[in-house]
Amino acid sequence: MPRKGPVVRREIPEDPVYSSRVVSQLIGRVLLSGKKSLAQRIVYSALDKVSMKASEDPVSVLRKALDNVRPSLEVRSRRVGGSTYQVPVPVRSHRADALAIRWLTVYSRARREKSMVDRLASEILDASNGVGATVKCKEDTHRMAESNRAFAHYRW
């Protein structure tokens, strides 16, 4: 906890094309080595592919994908008397959004398609349909929290 008072959360600007904060966050996660224009080109091209394949608004498909990926529980390590327990805790909304976007980019990079545009578009479509590696990661996180429910009373 900081001594100077509460930390003010930075306001994320909307992206210029879709006027969406979610797209802006996704661009920030795709960004590597400070190449923001390249990250924007990748995300916008991927969203164009999503709109062609899904034949609906790409931002709504992205939001649906993030809703399917957003975790509600996670485990945190808690040391009690010489042993470490995995304690399930609820995830705050900002962290849940950040985790969903992070998982989406990580698992899209791990895909086998040729370009990052194709990988990101495919992962967004898979996540919006409730399948894919990103959704599996969320289910694994929930399964881990469920299996350690006995240690929930150690929550701090």
Swiss-Prot record:
PROSITE patterns per UniProt: RIBOSOMAL_S7
Keyword tRNA-binding: yes
GO annotation (BP), single: translation
Matches recorded under InterPro entries: Ribosomal_uS7 (IPR000235), Ribosomal_uS7_bac/org-type (IPR005717), Ribosomal_uS7_CS (IPR020606), Ribosomal_uS7_dom (IPR023798), Ribosomal_uS7_dom_sf (IPR036823)
Gene3D superfamilies with a match to the protein in the record: Ribosomal protein S7 domain
Domain of life: Bacteria
Matching SUPFAM superfamilies: Ribosomal protein S7
Keyword annotations: Ribonucleoprotein, Ribosomal protein, RNA-binding, rRNA-binding, tRNA-binding
A Gene Ontology molecular function term of the record: rRNA binding
Annotated GO CC locations: small ribosomal subunit
Role description: One of the primary rRNA binding proteins, it binds directly to 16S rRNA where it nucleates assembly of the head domain of the 30S subunit. Is located at the subunit interface close to the decoding center, probably blocks exit of the E-site tRNA.
NCBIfam families: rpsG_bact
Family in the record: Belongs to the universal ribosomal protein uS7 family.
Subunit structure: Part of the 30S ribosomal subunit. Contacts proteins S9 and S11.
UniProt protein name: Small ribosomal subunit protein uS7
Organism field: Tropheryma whipplei (strain Twist)
